[in-house]
């Protein structure tokens, strides 16, 4: 894919800024808005295809436990009897009912869950459960990016506090020099009368 910066360079290098080339700018901007530059930290990558490596692993579902085996039919039955009830409320009710069951009532569902887990291990011997990462950190890192990715590189988004303090110190120092340059010069040479008054006051 042609990068946004190279596309802009090719557009402005053409004679007369052809309209056909200019029409491609919004499309390139939209496509490039989903991709960070290579200088982004690997911890906060925002590329749209970042999760492609684990896509095959994520498609494999976890084997059902005893509660899931039991609640399949119960959830469907409760949803039909209470069509206006929310899923969260249904889950709470099913959890309460599951706790009220005796061990003898739960045992058949534990046996079925063990069979399903054994079949799952045979079918996917290299399967490892990996909980999904929260997308909050990715959203925060992507929100720091500018609207136009070519204007400011990703590495400049994360400010360096030390450099920021140095810049503020330099700016303050330059302002003070500018203000001192406009002040009238101080006459350090005093007249003989003033020196006599000062020496007389010190003797007293």
UniProtKB/Swiss-Prot annotation:
Residues 60-128 bind DNA. Residues 175-204 are annotated as: Disordered. Pfam families: HMG_box (PF00505). GO terms for biological process: cell differentiation; male sex determination; positive regulation of gene expression; positive regulation of transcription by RNA polymerase II; sex differentiation. Keywords: Acetylation, Activator, Calmodulin-binding, Cytoplasm, Differentiation, DNA-binding, Nucleus, Repressor, Sexual differentiation, Transcription, Transcription regulation. InterPro entries: HMG_box_dom (IPR009071), HMG_box_dom_sf (IPR036910), SRY (IPR017253), SRY-related_HMG-box_TF-like (IPR050140). It is found in: Nucleus speckle; Cytoplasm; Nucleus. One of its GO terms (cellular component) is nuclear speck. Acetylation of Lys-136 contributes to its nuclear localization and enhances its interaction with KPNB1. Deacetylated by HDAC3. Its main location: nucleus. Residues 194-204 have a biased composition (Basic and acidic residues). It comes from the Eukaryota. GO terms for molecular function: calmodulin binding; DNA-binding transcription activator activity, RNA polymerase II-specific; RNA polymerase II cis-regulatory region sequence-specific DNA binding. Interacts with CALM, EP300, HDAC3, KPNB1, ZNF208 isoform KRAB-O, PARP1, SLC9A3R2 and WT1. The interaction with EP300 modulates its DNA-binding activity. The interaction with KPNB1 is sensitive to dissociation by Ran in the GTP-bound form. Interaction with PARP1 impaired its DNA-binding activity. Transcriptional regulator that controls a genetic switch in male development. It is necessary and sufficient for initiating male sex determination by directing the development of supporting cell precursors (pre-Sertoli cells) as Sertoli rather than granulosa cells. Involved in different aspects of gene regulation including promoter activation or repression. Binds to the DNA consensus sequence 5'-[AT]AACAA[AT]-3'. SRY HMG box recognizes DNA by partial intercalation in the minor groove and promotes DNA bending. Also involved in pre-mRNA splicing. PANTHER family: SEX-DETERMINING REGION Y PROTEIN (PTHR10270:SF161), SOX TRANSCRIPTION FACTOR (PTHR10270). Belongs to the SRY family. This is Sex-determining region Y protein. It comes from Macaca mulatta.
């Amino acid at each position: 894919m042609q990068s946004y910066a190279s596309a802009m360079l090719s557009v402005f290098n053409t004679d007369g800024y052809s309209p056909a080339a200019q029409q491609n700018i919004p499309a390139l901007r939209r496509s490039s808005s989903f991709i960070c530059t290579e200088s982004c930290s690997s911890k906060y990558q925002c590329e749209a295809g970042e999760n492609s490596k684990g896509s095959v692993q994520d498609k494999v579902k976890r084997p059902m436990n005893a509660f899931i085996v039991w609640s399949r039919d119960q959830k469907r039955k409760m949803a039909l009897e209470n069509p206006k009830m929310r899923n969260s409320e249904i889950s709470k009710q099913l959890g309460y009912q599951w706790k009220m069951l005796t061990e003898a009532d739960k045992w058949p569902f534990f046996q079925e869950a063990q069979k399903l887990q054994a079949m799952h291990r045979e079918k996917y011997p290299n399967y490892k459960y990996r909980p999904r990462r929260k997308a909050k950190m990715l959203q925060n890192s992507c929100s720091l990016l500018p609207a136009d990715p070519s204007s400011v590189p990703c590495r400049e988004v994360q400010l360096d506090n030390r450099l920021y303090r140095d810049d503020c110190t330099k700016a303050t120092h330059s302002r003070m020099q500018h203000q001192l340059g406009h002040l009238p010069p101080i006459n350090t040479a005093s007249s003989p009368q003033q020196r006599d008054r000062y020496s007389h006051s010190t003797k007293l």
